[in-house]
């Protein structure tokens, strides 16, 4: 605070620092210097500091000179100060004593007032207790007087035949009884109240007995006035729940016992539905008057209704639930999932229809909040039902995802049973015969598990070696392989009996690989259809975030798409190996023409047709299962790879022929014989030229067949180079003819 009040002298504007920096609480020399160095050199900073230091010294001298007289007179002004202070001590002590005395007097006065106020409050409370007890006695005597007078009048036939009068008297008693109850609660613990309590208990018992009898009489005679007076009386004494319980026991329970019969439900084909229909008839037929009086019916007049009652929620519904739980326990048994699903669906439909009989939305909310409602829902063991369904689906799927790949049923759009079973499992999860709204989260998780399991299965297939057996033979288990990961996770058993036991790998045929790719493509096409099946089910429970569902299915599509390249590569490699297995027969062409006197070739070799036969079979045999683009991709890849190897083979053959030809020429020249004559003994084409011509015919025929496959020869890698190679050889062969 002192620093903030000090005014430092102002320095020149040329200073490289702010003078107020020195007065800050967090002033730091190092920070100050480093900050100034950013603007000026150290020499300039030093000069500015020295300049300001001189200004400070000058200002300090001026300040001392200005107040010099006050500094000198300071000791003089303090002379006699001790004496003056001593003179003040005596009167201050007297003042202190007077203040303490006054404080004591005031405290005593306050204490006396508090004591009197406390006594008055105690007297007031006791007076209120006495008044309440007096009121209790008066109410008891008044009620007893009314009851006595009513008893004396019961001899009169006129009064006895007037239930309305009885209802009015009960209302008067109830009003007085209500006040009696209020004052009795306020007077709890008073000795006099204990003496009066037996009389109060007698009044209570008689009042409840009269009300029950009157209510039953009104229900039996369908007298709206009696029912109205009786229910109003129950409401007055805050016993509405007793009235609802009475209706449940006397009116509802006998009907429930007659309707809910287990033998009828099990023997009748639609026994459960018939039973629920009869239960739904109870409210409109037997509770009409009660609902009109209490405002539970649409036609009720507001002025004549007695609020505070809900007989459907508090009387009918608890008795229905109790009857179902006690007399029909098999209803909730999940052992038979199909029967359980049917019973659950019919029961939930019954609950929805019962809710529509509620008089208002508030009544529906009360019904859903009722303990019996929660008890009824908990009785349905949905987790056990789902577990049974889960095992059914998982077991069926795992039975198809085995080492032995079986064909799908004839009517299926899929080729393999594994794919057919996967799609049928997905559809079954959301079928009307299995789906339950409360299990939607479990069913969605099972859907993703099925898709993931199929993706793992396909990845495993892509790792299998390709066998040379036909598709019919490959259906038989070639070897016993290890089991794949199961959708049930943890139910597989250890198949190995020891560390020395080997597990051979299961092979797969090329046709089966083609089927896998076709099924993958088909399944990806049908996943949007699955989304359309799922949407209505999710809308049923109010779910709106369909983008997340769609994204999850797109992820599954991506995982399926990621499997295709490896499968395609495997198929292309196998086709290429098969194709080149025949194309390498070009190595046998020299043996066919050398020293055999065969005619000049005019047609292509048969090995070309043999090499292309698998490709034509692929195109014709699977065009209804695969997209043409996929087939074309495989054909192009197969031909590109095999043609490249074929090019190398033909090149080697032509080079070998050329070397043989040159070697023979050199040999003949060395023997000084007749110069080598390229023509044959009969003056025709030489064996070497026949070889060249045959290879040219083979390659030309190969190009023609490629076009028949729907491909352009220019799209096949190495084919252009191969065509140029044999064209040059053909030109050489024809050029040497005479």
UniProtKB/Swiss-Prot annotation:
It comes from the Eukaryota. It is a peripheral membrane protein. Keywords: Congenital disorder of glycosylation, Disease variant, Golgi apparatus, Membrane, Protein transport, Transport. Residues 474-504, 668-687 are annotated as: Disordered. GO terms for molecular function: protein-containing complex binding. Pfam families: COG2_C, COG2_N. Residues 483-500 have a biased composition (Polar residues). GO terms for biological process: glycosylation; Golgi organization; intra-Golgi vesicle-mediated transport; protein transport; retrograde transport, vesicle recycling within Golgi. Disulfide bonds: none annotated. It is found in: Golgi apparatus membrane. GO terms for cellular component: Golgi membrane; Golgi stack; Golgi transport complex; trans-Golgi network membrane. The keyword Acetylation does not apply. Belongs to the COG2 family. It is linked to Congenital disorder of glycosylation 2Q: A form of congenital disorder of glycosylation, a genetically heterogeneous group of autosomal recessive, multisystem disorders caused by a defect in glycoprotein biosynthesis and characterized by under-glycosylated serum glycoproteins. Congenital disorders of glycosylation result in a wide variety of clinical features, such as defects in the nervous system development, psychomotor retardation, dysmorphic features, hypotonia, coagulation disorders, and immunodeficiency. Required for normal Golgi morphology and function. Component of the conserved oligomeric Golgi complex which is composed of eight different subunits and is required for normal Golgi morphology and localization. This is Conserved oligomeric Golgi complex subunit 2. It comes from Homo sapiens (Human).
């Amino acid at each position: 605070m002192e620093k903030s009040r000090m005014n430092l002298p102002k320095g020149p504007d040329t200073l490289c620092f702010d003078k107020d920096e020195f007065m800050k609480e967090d002033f730091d020399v190092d920070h100050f210097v480093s900050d100034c160095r950013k603007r000026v050199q150290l020499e300039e900073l030093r000069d500015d500091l020295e300049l300001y230091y001189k200004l400070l010294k000058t200002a300090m001298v001026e300040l001392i000179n200005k107040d010099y007289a006050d500094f000198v007179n300071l000791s003089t002004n303090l002379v006699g100060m001790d004496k003056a202070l001593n003179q003040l001590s005596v009167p201050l002590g007297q003042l202190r004593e007077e203040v303490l005395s006054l404080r004591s007097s005031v405290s005593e006065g306050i204490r006396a007032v508090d004591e009197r106020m406390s006594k008055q409050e105690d007297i007031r409370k006791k007076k209120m207790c006495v008044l309440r007890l007096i009121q209790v006695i008066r109410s008891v005597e008044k009620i007893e007087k009314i009851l006595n007078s009513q008893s004396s009048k019961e001899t009169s036939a006129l009064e006895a035949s007037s239930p309305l009068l009885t209802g009015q008297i009960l209302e008067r008693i109830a009003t007085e009884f209500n006040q009696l109850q209020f004052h009795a609660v306020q007077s709890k613990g008073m000795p006099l109240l204990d003496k009066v309590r037996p009389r109060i208990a007698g009044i209570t018992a008689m009042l409840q007995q009269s009300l029950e009898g009157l209510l039953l009489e009104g229900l039996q005679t369908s007298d709206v006035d009696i029912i109205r007076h009786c229910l109003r009386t129950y409401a007055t004494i805050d016993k509405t729940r007793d009235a609802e319980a009475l209706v449940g026991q006397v009116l509802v329970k006998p009907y429930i016992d007659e309707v809910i019969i287990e033998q009828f439900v099990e023997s009748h084909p639609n026994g459960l539905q018939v039973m629920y229909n009869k239960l739904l008839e109870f409210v409109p037929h037997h509770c009409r008057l009660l609902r009109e009086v209490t405002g539970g019916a649409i036609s009720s007049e507001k002025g004549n209704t007695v609020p505070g009652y809900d007989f459907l929620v508090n009387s009918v519904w608890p008795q229905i639930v109790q009857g179902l739980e006690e007399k029909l326990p098999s209803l909730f048994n999940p052992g038979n999932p199909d029967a359980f699903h049917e019973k659950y669906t019919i029961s939930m439909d019954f609950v929805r229809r019962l809710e529509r009989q509620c008089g208002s939305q508030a009544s529906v909310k009360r019904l859903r909040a009722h303990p019996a409602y929660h008890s009824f829902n908990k009785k349905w063991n949905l987790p056990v039902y789902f577990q049974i369904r889960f095992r059914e689906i998982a077991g069926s799927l795992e039975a198809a995802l085995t080492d032995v790949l079986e064909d799908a049923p004839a009517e299926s759009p899929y080729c393999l049973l594994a794919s057919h079973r996967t799609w049928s499992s997905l559809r079954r999860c959301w079928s009307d015969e299995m789906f339950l709204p409360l299990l939607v989260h479990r069913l969605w998780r099972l859907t993703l598990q099925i898709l993931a399991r199929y993706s793992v299965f396909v990845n495993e297939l892509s790792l299998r070696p390709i066998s040379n057996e036909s598709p019919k033979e490959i259906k038989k288990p070639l070897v016993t392989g290890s089991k794949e990961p199961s959708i049930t996770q943890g139910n597989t058993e250890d198949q190995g009996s020891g560390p020395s036991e080997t597990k051979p790998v299961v092979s797969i045929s090329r046709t089966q690989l083609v089927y896998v790719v076709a099924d993958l493509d088909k399944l990806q096409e049908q996943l949007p259809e699955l989304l359309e099946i799922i949407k209505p089910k999710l809308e049923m429970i109010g779910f709106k975030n369909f983008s997340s569902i769609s994204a999850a299915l797109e992820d599954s599509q991506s995982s399926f798409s990621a499997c295709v390249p490896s499968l395609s590569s495997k198929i292309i490699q196998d086709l290429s190996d098969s194709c080149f297995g025949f194309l390498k027969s070009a190595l046998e062409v020299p043996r066919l023409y050398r020293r055999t006197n065969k005619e000049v070739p005019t047609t292509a070799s048969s090995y070309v047709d043999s090499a292309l036969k698998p490709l034509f079979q692929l195109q014709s045999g699977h065009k209804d299962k695969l997209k043409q683009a996929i087939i074309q991709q495989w054909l192009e890849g197969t031909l590109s790879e095999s043609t490249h190897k074929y090019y190398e083979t033909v090149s080697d053959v032509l080079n070998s022929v050329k070397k043989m030809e040159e070697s023979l020429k050199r040999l003949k020249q060395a023997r000084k014989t007749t110069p080598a004559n390229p023509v044959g003994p009969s003056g025709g084409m030489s064996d070497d030229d026949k070889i060249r011509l045959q290879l040219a015919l083979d390659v030309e025929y190969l190009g023609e067949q490629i076009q028949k496959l729907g491909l352009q020869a220019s799209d096949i890698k190495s084919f252009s180079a191969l065509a140029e190679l044999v064209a040059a050889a053909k030109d050489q062969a024809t050029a040497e003819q005479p």
